[in-house]
Amino acid sequence: MSVPLVEQPVRMTLKQVVDYLNAGIAEAEVFLSPARSSKLQMEQCVALDVLSYNATRVKHEAVRRDDENAANLFLGFECAIGAIRSELMMWILLKRDMPNEAWNRLVAAQMGCLDATRAHGSFADCERRLKDLEKLESQIFPPQVFLSAGFVANRLDCSICGERYSKCEHLRGKPYMGQFCEVIHRNPRADHVAMVKAPADKRCRVVSFKTKDGHRDRLSWEISPYRDDEVFKDDDALEVESIFLTADRYPYMVPTEKILGPLTS
């Protein structure tokens, strides 16, 4: 791996750190193709783990200096690095014949690009990358049935200040000193689930549906046989397996090993 660990990032100038992070991203982008070696792609993912770690270190240093612009800049780098890493993992997982896991990495890459543009104005290139990923979605994956779940909560709090969201000045999705404002739902309760065309989270979707032969996966189209206690009736309503809620708001931040397993030689 050619991305070194920055032992003392505080001794580097802002330009040096930015150049270092951009160089690591540019090197990884060379491998954004299904034709590239999976082994080399995985090595790049691990290199991006290191790059992300260093971006986080310099972000924390900016926070200690009370430099909000720099903190938000490096938050953007965390998002952009995570997006590239997620896209690399998507290709690896597709080549492993794991389309559902690959779909989640594609969505993570899209979320990372979008968050990078929200974090700081220096990531306009991520807007172009997001459009490319949306095109890639329709070229690689079949159309999906998306779901959206509605919830009610006792109160909504701000993740930045901890106050009621309706009374504070922070805005959801905006960066503040290196972190995004999120709304925390206190004591949430499910209200409804609906099929939608444009979900807030594309990971929420119909995963499989029942056929006379078993559960058919909507991505791989493979059929999993029924368990002994399962039955299928032609006159019944359509039964599906679905995901209608995800807990991880920042899936692109997940390190390589947790998704792909350990790097083997």
Give the location of each predicted region.
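Signature of dsDNA virion morphogenesis modules
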Residues: 1-265
